[in-house]
Amino acid sequence: MKDDCAPKDDFDLAVIGAGSAGFSAAITAAEGGKRIALIGHGTIGGTCVNVGCVPSKTMIRAAEAVHGAQSAHRFPGLRGEAQVADWAALVAAKDDLVSTLRQKKYADLLPGYDGVTYLDEGPARLVEGGVEIGGRKITAPKVIVATGGRPAVPDIPGILDVPTLDSTSLLELERLPESLILLGGGYIGVELAQMMARMSTRVTIVCRSRLLPRAEPEVSRALAEVLR
């Protein structure tokens, strides 16, 4: 990886977004002998490692451990008990794993690709012939926009007047809440609802039609029965 002090700001490719998609595109192009400007903004690594799959699945697996112990009584002669004794410690362990994987899977890999120049100088703006970032123009005949996404706040009257969480901030809570209302019955809402319920939070799911609306109706009905 070359640093951002390179004398020339002309590249074969500019990639806006240093998440999994942008990272993969930059590395693939570098392996083909191209010069790439990989433009990030904020924390490297994107959604999956920072606020998506890695943190959520870590907490979900912890909830499964609690549920497994509590369900031991289903077998004759077994009894198990488990509860969340230190929520803050659980969140801290999740954050530590995220930090470790972000370093190993992203930051530590870049030095091995001389064709990639990583730039983190603020928001990027598309201009004719390339990208403008940090007050200078990066020229490139091709630009890949891989900026990812973020949780969307639904257009519900009054929602901005009350404290709300999203799939990111839920996993950053300093205290385990006694109760939660989750708006939305998609797969993300359902898996987070089950996770929090297994952690002892009282959870209510509010959805417009049915759980997992893109799945077969039979699946939705079966899931609703299980969650009840």
What name fits each language-model region?
Residues 11-38, 189-198:
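N-terminal Rossmann-like FAD-binding beta1-loop-alpha1 element of flavoenzymes
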Residues 2-11, 27-34, 39-176, 209-213, ...:
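Glycine-rich flavin
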Residues 1, 59, 195-199:
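Detector for methionine-enriched segments
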Residues 20, 149, 186:
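Flexible, active-site-proximal loop/turn residues at the rims of small-molecule/cofactor binding pockets
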Residues 7-19, 176-183:
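Beta1/beta-strand and adjacent pyrophosphate-binding region of the FAD-binding site
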Residues 174-215:
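Rossmann-like NAD(P)H-binding beta-loop-alpha module
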